[in-house]
Amino acid sequence: VRENKLNECYIRPIVFLGHNQMGLNPNGVNIRVAIAAWPWGAYLGDDGINKGIRVRVSSFTRHHVNITMTRAKACGYYVNSILAKAEAVHDGYDESILLDPQGYVSEGSGENIFLLSKGRLKTPALSCSNLEGITRDSVFEICKHLKVEVEEGFITRDELYIADEVFLTGTAAEITPIREIDNRKIGNGKRGKITARIQKIFFEIVRGNHIKFKKWLTEV
């Protein structure tokens, strides 16, 4: 961040195999690390942060856990995400939601997902082919602070449709409300109260304005 003279930015570390060997066997191949940083606004738009986004359930599904190491954040897996995202944008939506091979809700194309129903906040269990996101974990801690209980488990597609609130979490997406899924309005079609409370504290934390979570930050 300092090297690139940036104030607010996105940081992407990448670990990859070197050039000293061809083939599919990684043993003995040099490991390289690159870190990129660049200015980047709200991934799903400022309006998305404030008013919520429109999403669709993708025709593509997340990988089965026996196909690959689904809990790893590996570049090759993102072909699945690219297909889902491109399909959603082509059809006029902002983002997609993918189901797991059993038909349960997994995550967004690059984000974890939470829903609020009858006062209970729920998110898919990590057995649903989803990533154990850092922002997902951060929301757990924020919810403890707010005394909001979070339940991990299996979520069906129709639970999304009848939820009071739904939001996405991610390093790029931050906390982004969902106002519509498959042309069905979520709640009152606006950012929900619980989502707004979580979002407010999250942005206070990342900007260094929340004393309780100061330990999460590294000053530059």
Task: Give the positions of each predicted feature.
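Compositionally biased, intrinsically disordered low-complexity regions used as flexible
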Residues: 3-4, 59
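Helix-start/capping segments and mature chain N-termini
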Residues: 16, 22-220
